Amino acid sequence: MPSGEGRTTPMTMPTTDDRRRTAEPIDLDRLTLAAVREGALEGRPVTVLGLARSGLALARFFSAVGARVTVYDRRPAEELRQAIEALAGRAIAFRLGPGVDPVTTWRRAALVATSPSIQPAFPTAEPRLRAALADLVRRRAAGDPTAPPLVSELDLFLRLCPAPTVGVTGTKGKTTTAALSAAILAADPSHRVFLGGNIGRPLVDELLELRPEDRVVVEISELQLPTLSRGTTVAVYTNVTADHLDRHGTVEAYRRVKRRLAELVDPRGALVLNAEDPVTAALAGLGGAPTVMYRRSLPIPGGVGVVDDWIVAAGVAPLPLVGGGTAGLGPGGRILPVGELRLPGAHNLSNALAAVAVGLLFGLAPDAIRRAAAGFAGVEHRLEVVAVVDGVRFVNDSQGTQPDAVAAALRAFEPPIVLIAGGRDKGVDLAPLGPIVADRAVAAVLIGESAPQLETLFRSAGLERVERAPDLATAVRRADAIARAAREGTTAPEATVLLSPAAASFDMFVDYADRGRAFKAAVVEIARERGVRVSAAGASKPDAAPTLPAGAAPTDGAGGEVGER
């Protein structure tokens, strides 16, 4: 295997005439999946930038269709051993290490494909690569006939996908909404459903197997949106609040990025928007597609809402392009009682409303939607109830990395609550979090780099008990002891230990999923010591087939924690 800067795997070298013929830039606007299946990319030189999750998928795809693939990553081979081994046996050249000039990897390429965090405008790519990509973009814009096109993994997928797609974006709630939407669509056995994107599964892996009658649900992050030139059939927005300001600089810039999916939506499709979020609601009318609004109160005509504790629809018609119709709704447009949802918290009710709208747009019968929604238990690392041990409920919300998400998690459970928080600061305003923590939590146990900042914030808001712990396992034990003591002498049936960090994970963990697994392992150890049996994978996992396997972490590229909400 490669071991050092610039080392490559053996390849059959093309002739000079072959190079001239195959290095002509690929016309992406004319490329179709049918043409790819018939050999349109065979022998064409393609450069893949980045060897993380999306880069691996791109390398597999282009190799499978006969392209001559070169992979560039600034990290040395020793750090990429697992990824390189995953591509063993394929005719792929590796150009690895900080000494490799990225420009040399695409000088004779017909196409350059990238992971989401490798793009000219974002600081997540290293400066030399960012400058080289910016120059490539300028050459393309100037009409340079030798400049290869630049395409992201997700944009390539959306360009070639033959099936209707549902794109889900927003600041928080994306993963739950996407997974529940997929579970609802899967209730119709006549269509296969694929779930991927930022949720952890690069969908380009599925391209060659897709058929027009399939359904695809894509979670789309703010890293992926700027790379898109094609939209989805249906675009779903959960909410848009301040986040990732370390990448975008201002709230306004972040909001401009988030508009992208609405601007690109298929005009024959639909926009599904949260009427209770003013930024999201203002997107109505973009892209020329009709809008379906949802809210946790009386539904807007043509939308989804709640009446008398029932989720109801007010005239949501199925999309003509997906074929078929929908069964008649019950009295008052009833679909299912709110109480049948297994997802805790008002924010999860909003997520469910959006997913119900998706089901209706694709012609699902209300009883099928009801069964799927009522059977959906949630997504790993998002308000995941791991276990209840001696009257203490342990909740893994490792993906709660910003104040709004933590506040929603605190409101989802009854007191007493002990909050575990801390990690690497994301550069967002944490001040609004202080009052809700002081109001809802009896104590906080803090870890990581942001612990001092959070301690000052929580104490100044009036929270009397704030402790620091050197690591997460210690924090879980301290929080457990505090929670058990807080429950004594009260009528509360359970106390809750809630991991909802209000911070990224990179100071102590690989990513938020690694942090969540560490939390669950600590809970399992406490349970074992007390003779309580609990699975290390936790108790709250999706029941539906199209969800991810446990441990699939939506991270990619050059250090961007894409999946953290």
Where are these regions (language model features)?
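Beta-strand->loop->alpha-helix junctions that form or flank phosphate-binding loops
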Residues: 70-75, 95-99, 149-156, 194-196, ...
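N-terminal leader/targeting and accessory segments in enzymes
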Residues: 2-152, 344, 538-542, 546
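Phosphate-binding loop of NTP-binding sites
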Residues: 102-109, 116, 120-275, 279-290, ...
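Glycine/aspartate-rich loop-and-adjacent alpha/beta segment that forms the canonical ThDP
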Residues: 502-528
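Active-site beta-alpha connecting loops in nucleotide-dependent enzymes
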Residues: 41-60, 70-82, 379, 398-472, ...
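Short glycine-rich anion-binding loops that position phosphate/pyrophosphate groups of nucleotides
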Residues: 116-120, 173, 222-223, 242-243, ...
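Residue-level signal for inorganic ion chemistry
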Residues: 62, 112, 168, 198, ...
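Nucleotide phosphate-binding/pyrophosphate-handling subdomain across enzymes
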Residues: 29-45, 58-65, 332-441, 456-459
